[in-house]
From Swiss-Prot:
Signal peptide: none
Gene it is expressed from: rplU
Domain of life according to the entry: Bacteria
Single GO molecular function: structural constituent of ribosome
SUPFAM superfamilies per UniProt: L21p-like (SSF141091)
Keyword Nuclease: no
Subunit and interaction comment: Part of the 50S ribosomal subunit. Contacts protein L20.
Assigned keywords, A-Z: Ribonucleoprotein, Ribosomal protein, RNA-binding, rRNA-binding
GO cellular-component term (any): ribonucleoprotein complex
Protein name: Large ribosomal subunit protein bL21
Function: This protein binds to 23S rRNA in the presence of protein L20.
Region (Disordered): 104-128
């Protein structure tokens, strides 16, 4: 099953376990957010929204907040010794799609537990 969602003015086709980068969404790392603007649900019997599918949402886990690549805008007016250089970086949220929900259901899965790094085993002294 797949869904077409709209967030940040862009549309994305998603399936469960997809990882995607979208414009900044409020939420702490590791929390589950719900994306409510579902334009289409696909599968055996596709549902097309007018403009959105009623009662459908997509649950996603926030993996990271970061900044995108620098975009430079350079304007030059020839023969006038006039130029302007500006740059910016978008704020990006990395999401993992956990579930596609229909009929107003709530997400059944909570946030995944944090990974704990395994402590290295104490090295046995070879000299003894």
């Amino acid at each position: 099953m797949f869904a077409v969602i709209k967030t940040g003015g862009r549309q994305y086709r998603v399936v469960p376990e997809d990882v995607l980068e979208v414009g900044k969404i409020e939420g702490d790392v590791g929390t589950i957010v719900q994306l409510g603007e579902v334009l289409m649900l696909g599968g055996d019997t596709p549902l097309i929204g007018l403009p959105t599918v009623a009662g459908a949402s997509v649950a996603a886990e926030v993996l990271d907040h970061k900044r995108g690549p620098k975009v430079i805008s350079f304007k030059k007016r020839r023969r006038k010794n006039s130029k302007r250089k500006r740059g910016y970086r978008d704020e990006i949220t990395v999401l993992r799609i956990t579930e596609i929900l229909a009929d107003g259901k709530s997400p059944s899965v909570g946030p995944r537990p944090k990974r704990v790094k395994a402590e290295p085993a104490p090295a046995a002294d070879a000299a003894e």
